[in-house]
Every structure is written in C-alpha cells, then in structure tokens.
Amino acid sequence: SGAESIAQDKELTKELLHAAGVSVPMGHVVDNPDDAWRVAQSLGKSVVVKPKDGNQGKGVAVNIHLEEQVRMAFSVAQQYGSKVIVERYMPGQDFRLLVVGDALVAAARRDPPQVIGDGVHSIKDLVDQINLDPLRGDGHATALTKIRLDEIALATLVKQNLTIDSIPIQGARVVLRNNANLSTGGSATDVTEDVHPDLAASAVTAAKMVGLDICGVDVVCEDIYRPFEDQGGGVVEVNAAPGLRMH
C-alpha cells in the first residue's frame, strides 16, 4: 500500500513527522567520507551513521564522534545501501509503541542481544562479560537468557563482516541477532502503563502522518514516562505492524 511504501522511505517519513512537530533525529544523506564528517561536525556531539535503505541494524554505527570513526563507519554503511545517512545520535533506550487508530495500545522496551565495542576486547570477550550477569541463565527461570554465540549469531556477525575474534571500535554496536526475542538473549519489558500522554500523542501523530491504521512506532528516549521536550529523544522509525499488515 501507499502508506507502507512511505514507511519504508525513512527520510520521507522523517520529513513528514518533522513537519507535523514530532521529534525526530535530524540528519542528511551523504555521498562520501568527507561529506559524512562535515555533516557530523554540523550536527555536533555524537552521530549515527547508517545505510539509507538498510534494515535490521546492518552496517549501523551508533554514538560515534571522532573523524576516523565517522570515516570508517561510512565505508561500512556503504556496503549495505547505495546512500548513507548521518544523523544526530539520540541517547536512550529503544521502545516499540503499538498504535491502533487513535490509540496507543501497548508499549515495550526492547533490547536485542548486542555488545558495544570498547576498542580493546573481542566480541567473544564482550559477550562473556554480559553473560556473567546473574540475571542471565540458560532457561526460562531467569529474567534474561544468556546470549548464545550459535550459528545464527555467527551468521549475523558475518553479515557485519565480523567474527567472534573481531575487536569492535569504541562505541560500535554489534548486534548478535536481528530481533529482540527473549529466548535468544534479547529482552523486552512491558511499559504500557508508563508512557507519558504527550509521548503517546506523538506516536499517534506519527502513525497518522504515515497513514497506517495499525503500526509500530519505534522511539528512542531515556525515559518513556517523560515527554520528548524534557529529555531529547524522538521517533526513529514507523513500521507497518508485524503480523498485523492490512492487505
């Protein structure tokens, strides 16, 4: 449908939302590493570098601010999409808000199994550190499942041109699975009751602007119980809700 194709064009979505007064991470499409660094400097602070038509976090670098990091991230992102976007980094947590019509019906905080590089440790070491968390176990009895370096994780790494022995640069986010399923080391927490009314209204506006009756609005912010104005953050993506597409 038209609405779904709008939702797939991330830049168009962002422009529509910005025009409607919804907070979004501003950014620009860049053609080369020099361009990427120039835009990064103009945005100030930290940036995200990602392929324009990428999905599922492939070729994405978050929270980087040094010139060499930005240039390296550009060359990685370029392998996954024709164009590369540099945008303002929004610190915070990932939330998925489910909007049906005029109402926010559910919200969850989502954390896929991932490690953040420190420029020193290998991916295997970083995973081992995370798995030491007493909340993580091997079954369903614990709050979180240990992150598994299984075939899917290895394949996910290969897609990012990495192995378990790779040492990711400082701040590079390495996703070990492309989803936040609890059973595979991701985590999701129901926060429906906590969403601030202004933030819920922003999500509904976002869905309306894109023209989807049922959609998942992905939000990044520090706290879901405060409006965007108080903390920065904003809507990073609008998706036709998985499993609920209207054909």
PLM-predicted stretches and their roles:
Residues G2-R148, P197-A201:
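Active-site nucleotide/adenylate-binding loops and adjacent lid/helix of ATP-dependent enzymes
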Residues M26-P33, L154-T163, D213-V219:
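Short, mixed-charge, low-aromatic patches
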Residues A103, D111-D118, S122, K159, ...:
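ATP-dependent carboxylate activation and anion-phosphoryl transfer catalytic cores
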